[in-house]
Amino acid sequence: SFVSRGLGDVYKRQSLNDVIAQGAQGVMGAACSGTSLAILDTAIAAEVVMVSPSNTSPQFTKIDKKGFYARTAPSDLLQGDVLASLLVEDGVQTVSIISRADSYGRGLAEATAAAFEAAGGTVKTIVYHATDASEFTSEVTAVGKGGADAIVGILFPETGCGVLQPAFEQGLLDTPWYMTDGVKDAGLASLCGLGTALDGFKGTAPGSAAGEAKDAFEAAYAEVSADGSPTFIFAPQAYDAVMLMAISAAANGVTGPEIASGLVAASSGGE
């Protein structure tokens, strides 16, 4: 069963309750870190396993998940370090950050800032925008006032254009921008109506290690994808999330507690 609901916490919990009522013992998701954090207690209480392919918030390492939660994407503590290293390699000495005000955005912004400052850089400002905002001019103006060498944008598609369009109008796209996985989409410039204005933008995103497994996955995916593309952001991790639960269920049993008991073993060995 696939469930997509509104953004409010009530709808998030209802989405999970819907699949639990259908007898689900394992759930692949949620996609957004904030959503998973909002519904994890519900899953734990129902003894239903959640495995997310795209939750990257560092917050998950700090909470007790009772064994019923796992993720196949790395923490943004790693991405923050990689992004900071990229900035330093490019000679950036000062940076300003504009980010979503949620667990994903704050976690990645803080991780990036800490790593960049540890490497000798200076963070001019971090500006957070509300996740349900529809107008971002004041936030864009604030991040531009920092006068930094570069700007980091930690955004989602539904808000990314709202940030980039006023940035274009204010001439801020002449400053180097570094984006993250939330807007890793080759069609972003077209979606935002910005033509070639985003050419040259750089960024970071979780990926998969090169090798036979990655090549085999991309070949198989290309055969069934509508446009023949070999993959998309978090697609390999989504496959891994489903297979992780399936392998554990096959070895231990199909109830939530049985699946949970074998997640660590199922993810060991590298095969």
What kind of feature is each model-predicted range?
Residues S1-E271:
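Extracytosolic ligand-binding ectodomains
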